[in-house]
């Protein structure tokens, strides 16, 4: 275990009063109201939370001083269920009592190797064998890591944060808190040490009133998902003495992710102090208002980057986490106060005394802070990247995030250094291996533990410690956290697992705590870039030193950066970049520490490519929202937690989800010399030259932090990202967060603008990218940074880590997106940066993560078999997922793979959360991208994409070509895309088409999360998608590794010709559209495929959908042109094409649009030419499918998953998809590409038509089924149509049709996964699908397909695929019309009217046969329909479960519809024919698909309602009326439907018609009325009565009176209700005959008023009896008591107390004269005489008694 002590020591130092002042988080300091309010609202700190030390008042929390926040005990954490600002709910956040939390901490830390705060000495005591305690205590690595990093004894206790302190205990166990914060009911502020909790106010002034500043708030803010924040990283092995953070050697899992600390970096007290991560508070501080940071407080700004981003509480939270985590960040901030606070921050649980603890703070503050930073990073918004990274990236991201966090640039540096160290990933893996399942949050601890084990390596890779933490976060999550984050299996659960996400959004480096203003953030971003530039020198030198102990420079930089608040922002700019580039930065951090640090906050220009990319994007977006950098809805807050506060983001069950550690921008990250790793580079943001690597490493850092030998000779920022230095999940996570928080469209555009549109940001981004690119990728220009992001993402995708990273991103993004409502705007910029950054890391991870993720994969393999096999194994072996054929789609798939592979294992736990996340992102972003935003996105994308593409190509070629570069690229792209999903539609599009796919996936994942119907299935689908992407990439790599023409080569010559011709036909429009649609499709496909794979456990499906996706992609691109996307992004399309050329396998990496546009062609060609091989690969990857159809199946399924896998709502589609997939399994070879494309189109279409998804989806589903049914001949037609439309069509062989059918069913099955979140994309997909399948029917055909996929599916089953729909020809135009109306209208709404109309026009061209029969397009349609139906129905199981939707959505054409012979000469329609013949299904089909006008009249003027009424089809009549049939429709002779019903004596229909307002008074033109048409007495009587009621009747006319009966009329006389007189109540004399009095009801009559009778119990022996007052009787009889007693001695007289009498009477149910009681005193003790009421007395009183017998009406009188 790493000695977390130094880092945590820093954290604690950070917490001390001095640090508090430095952070500018003084209690008196008030955080901007806007931030505070938003954060407060989000945080919703619950005072009732049992905080042992400090409960933060919600209002107070907002005002809480940064240090005060830090001082809060973890138990002061927000109660579970508390929502963190930015709408981040950290379910993992559990209220953890001081004691309870500590107890929980050890248990949760068992995996983390951290002991609860209560047991400082047991700091590393995890429940698992990996317990850090064992490491710390015994000095032996708990996880087999040699060299527990012992900090000095003092450090150990004071500097090392306990698991609780780190928030790890909760994350580790995830049992205690519903928020998945294992072990802790409350999130203990990472910086808060148990000692600190107990610390005297004098020592820790800010701790003085922890209750005041409820740590709860901060803890809630703290990313509790930072599983990678293993306390062991900061383990206070050395109880006293100087704290050292030892990172395992680079050869360990995350060598490239060096910790901020140098090898046994010695954090000087001042350094630690300075490095104290304000973000530790910032994790809580992520709510700036919480930290009480003032805009003017530069320190606060660094410390609480999130503070600037109040509207993104979540983002803020992430930011806070980032900032808080890196002690260096604190160092960057105010130097002297920080050091103390920082050291304090890492409060070392082991510290025996507060003084010792305090003492260690300054010394270890940076190191522990850094270490802690990493784990917290895991919990941060960078979790998304972390998630995908699944350990490697998580670490990188952890570091990156933390470093990014404005508050803790120093920390940031630490994180990056750690990432550079890269050793932590291995530790992380090891940790994961041990506690994958049961230590979701404990992953961080485990990472730390692993780090501890790798003491030497950790020492060497002190910077790696942070990374380790991240890696651990990413990996340790496996067991329990995977469930939490099933969507993003690889990721830490933090980002994906929303409930636990403290800071889902990559913590934007909105570090400037002072100003939460958006513009400030924007400035912050720009400033960040500047800060990077001007602060980087310090940052670099300070990075290592800061990590190691040098924080003077860092502090200075931090001070300068944060002093202005803007500088802090500037510092956060890297952080923001890191946040937006969270994933990328993280990866870069893994690859290059600089990236990592930068990643947390806004994307920094400095971070090689990611940093730069994100920086501009982050900067631009940052101004938009509070802090766009925190796109994830989580501030890029690096959580600076004391070792004792193992603060792990509960929402990051994935090991890759990292809690970003914000490092002040001022911090200079100098290359850290990691032992065995070579120089570790701090985050570019921290680098003086503004590049990822230090000057000496700028051009080609050899990834001194343990780049694997397989890695390229140089490491760019993207390489770093790819290497896991920057966790892609962290980067993409932000974008997703943005999507959720802010409108996806807005987010997309925000990203776009933030990153591209903003000239300053762009220039800054370019500069940063150039610098970092120059440093990292000397050959890659500024744009290359962006593109390399994609490209590297693609490359990284090959790496397990990257995939995992993106999976986390997906989940985190989903989480973020859901919770990013407030932080959305702020997240936008970061998302952009992160997406790009995420993309970058993708490629690099292929190289570095190959090794790192090999170990990570091993670790993650424990976490997730899927991840291990797919993500990690692919990184190492890629054969499983390298589908040469699918490689074209692999770009998208890769990114999807990264997301989905990771997501599935996490998704299992999280269910549809991850997919939903992705979906959400896809939904919104794709919408802008495909519809309105698509052109802008494309335009924005092209410039960057173009250059970036080329650069990416180079990077891919260098990094990825050697191995499964394409696969890696695609996976990286996938991963990057996951991260970039949000910005994919906007700025992300330019960067990477796979980004868009990821965005779509994010939307889809989000939809899944929202729908949660596909929770696991969605995760499976996503996983399958990712696996398929990987297979596809492998295929590509195998066949055409990383070549421009690889995709082209993948397609068979015919397909290529066809596709080429199609594209040539529509060179720009089609290409761009194709790119857009393909991007969306690819995104959705990949994501969906992953989901589908999980759902169906059919990697084949995944592959098949991918193939299908690719095959269909060209058509998809063409439909987009119809959509109008074509026109806008023509150049982007060209760029996309070029990008595609640049990186055949990294197509997605390079540009989602281009890849999407060309990938389909390539995929088709590839599949045609290499169909067998892809199938083989698919078979390898998916064990459940046939080899030959496997590819097609997988392609179809992938498309289905992409389209529907992310739509949990469409169960019915899912079933259809399943069925189709089964069908397609047999015929999978021919049409995988096309079907994939169709499905892609559907996926894109839902994105485009998010609003009209329900209708469109339903219709496309039917159309799909229909097309499916007619796939054989339709295929041929499709070929021609595709060619005509410029849609690359496969051979159109029957197998493809069959495959399409199968795939369609598979799609339908999987579509539910993706549909909910990709409705808009679904529409696009539909459009594309129609283009793919019904090439001619561009707009409506797709809609028709949407309407008829089920039909086609059914038809495919019932009718020969090649059979023409001659009889249903009339239906096809109508169906098209219907589709156009439903989906087309929707398209119109979504600015796709053109496409809709166009599609409609084209649909008629193919004719009904074509529309119904194209199997290839139909299979996408069913998939699309599933997509559409899923969102609406959310019925994953029932493909046609949406009967109501069937009305709105397309229903598959019933076989009868084709068999019906319609007499068109008579003007008859299929609807009329079906209504006449009673074919209800056909009628419904026609109605739902609007095949025919419900009121269409034949030549005689008869409509369908006439026909149904005349023939008595009640149900059909009802359907017709429900669909708006004119109840009084008149034929030419004036006959109304009512007349037909009466004439034919259909009484029920008459009733129904009358209920619908039929006019019974209307007569035919010949004068016949309904009364003259009756043929039965019943009808006549009914009509007579009805008319009488209408017209009224005379009062004396009773003939027509209606009789109304009660329910008794329905009962037999002998079984009537209970007869009251049958068994009257009362005592029965057993001596008397039964019938004497048993059935008598007694009535008493008297001439005078009866005396009141009282039912009283006078003795215990007897029950209550009837009594009269003796006084009343005497009055009545006018005699005295004595005379009465003597005359009637037989009458019983008793005496009772008045009070008792009153009590009994008043409570008697038989007493009904309350007025009689008024004369009695309830409290009187006087005695009352009572006389028993008997017949004799009654007679005496002159009353007559009657007994009424039920059977005898006679009565006897007794006197």
UniProtKB/Swiss-Prot annotation:
Chain intervals for the UniProt region annotation (Necessary and sufficient for interaction with PCGF1): 1638-1752
Location of the region described as Disordered in the Swiss-Prot/TrEMBL record: 100-120, 399-432, 540-635, 739-795, 1079-1190, 1222-1334, 1397-1456, 1612-1635
Signal peptide segment: none
Highest taxon of source: Eukaryota
Example GO molecular function: DNA-binding transcription factor binding
GO cellular component, one term: BCOR complex
Post-translational modification Phosphothreonine, affected residues: 1128
Amino acid composition bias (Low complexity), ranges on this chain: 552-580, 1426-1439
One annotated GO biological process: odontogenesis
Polar residues bias spans: 582-617, 1298-1316, 1440-1451
Tissue: Expressed in heart, liver, lung, skeletal muscle, spleen and testis.
Family matches, as InterPro entries: Ankyrin_rpt, Ankyrin_rpt-contain_sf, BCOR, BCOR-like, PUFD, PUFD_som_sf
Compartmental location: Nucleus
Keyword Zinc listed: no
Covalent cross-link Glycyl lysine isopeptide (Lys-Gly) (interchain with G-Cter in SUMO2) as placed by the record, residue numbers: 787, 873, 1259, 1417
Compositionally biased spans, kind Basic and acidic residues: 739-767, 776-786, 1081-1111, 1169-1178, 1256-1282
One of the Pfam families matching this protein, by short name: PUFD
Family: Belongs to the BCOR family.
Role of this protein: Transcriptional corepressor. May specifically inhibit gene expression when recruited to promoter regions by sequence-specific DNA-binding proteins such as BCL6 and MLLT3. This repression may be mediated at least in part by histone deacetylase activities which can associate with this corepressor. Involved in the repression of TFAP2A; impairs binding of BCL6 and KDM2B to TFAP2A promoter regions.
Subunit structure: Interacts with CPNE4 (via VWFA domain). Isoform 1 may interact with MLLT3/AF9. Interacts with BCL6; the interaction is direct. Forms ternary complexes with BCL6 and SMRT/NCOR2 on selected target genes promoters; potently repress expression. Can interact with HDAC1, HDAC3 and HDAC5. Interacts with PCGF1; the interaction is direct. Interacts with KDM2B. Component of an approximately 800 kDa repressive BCOR complex at least composed of BCOR, RYBP, PCGF1, RING1, RNF2/RING2, KDM2B and SKP1.
This protein's name: BCL-6 corepressor
Species of origin: Mus musculus (Mouse)
